[in-house]
Amino acid sequence: MKSLVTGAAGFIGSHLVEYLVSKGIEVRAFVRYNSRNSWGWLEELSVKKNIEIYTGDIRDYDSVKDAMKGVDVVFHLAALIGIPYSYVSPLAYVKTNVEGTYNVLQAARESHIQRVIHTSTSEVYGTAQYVPIDEKHPINPQSPYAATKSGADQLALTFYRSFGLPVSVIRPFNTFGPRQSARAVIPTIIIQILAGNKKIKLGNLDTTRDMNYVLNTVEGFWHVGLHDNSVGEVINLGSEREISIGDLAKLIADLVGEKIEIEIDQQRIRPEKSEVERLLCNSTKARELTGWKPRYSLEEGLKATISWLKEHMQYYKPDIYNV
């Protein structure tokens, strides 16, 4: 089997590429073209010699279709993901997340791809109206990012219903782990502590999230890809454990072995009506359809992430907040 992974140079994408190669899968990695010929996090992988790199742009239909030649399965992860920046440049999110997904779906349809695994996000649910959140929970995106991901999800499901394209939609809750951008809360906390800061700058401490280690998430992709009964389905992937951002910061500080104070930084707080107050996953459907369940606990994932960040601090700027 040959697979195409879009967004392969990014956080989850690079872990998925690594995992697929470990399973003996032939992988073509779709990487956004850049003049430096950088392959992003794929440069760090010991298995990079086993990966076929394809440089292009998810917004360019021709390059997307060309990348699908000889491919059986497409894992579509390419997206603009930073929520704060979606307030600054929402059109960029429409072009990448909605139009880019259309390009993937239409190219897959014309190329007779056997399976398409499309990546959603728990952000499309908005603040939980009930918990744990299952796939029947109302969709209520509260940021431009979430709105574009919701639109992309609906496109994917429509291609299944209208054209018979064998699409599955994976909806990961808050994935974390090595290689994640400091725009995400866990690496933000860790790098500030590792930099020796005694006061850690954060936004809303009361919001709760379901934090799922990245290796759990990529194993979920694998399981969904293996099971044809997931075609046409939306499938949540989460740890089924809820923690507030304040408690998360304290847990990380304990694991690092440091005492911290938390300072509320107003620029890190979302607009009031845009804040997602609570997320907690119900992964029953994933277990029933594919047999997937998370193998790594929050604490195990945090320890691995802390260890990795200690060795890779050169990639991060702890004192600069970048949306």
Predicted regions mapped to residue ranges:
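N-terminal Rossmann-like NAD(P)+-binding domain of SDR-like oxidoreductases, especially those catalyzing
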Residues: 1-175, 296, 304-323
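A short C-terminal helix-loop "cap" of Rossmann-like NAD(P)-dependent dehydrogenase/epimerase domains
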Residues: 47-51, 163-166, 190-201, 227, ...
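Residue-level signal for the nucleotide or nucleotide-sugar donor/cofactor binding architecture
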Residues: 59, 88, 96-99, 143, ...
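Non-catalytic, hydrophobic alpha-helical segments
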Residues: 74, 217, 221, 237, ...
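Glycine/proline-rich active-site loop of Rossmann-fold NAD(P)-dependent oxidoreductases
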Residues: 150, 175-188, 195-200, 214-215, ...
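Hydrophobic alpha-helix immediately C-terminal to the catalytic Tyr-X-X-X-Lys motif of short-chain
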Residues: 151, 155, 159, 189, ...
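C-terminal "lid/loop" region of Rossmann-like NAD(P)-dependent oxidoreductases
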Residues: 204, 233-235, 246-249, 257-278, ...
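Conserved C-terminal active-site "lid" loop/helix of NAD(P)H-dependent oxidoreductases
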Residues: 214, 234, 269-293, 304
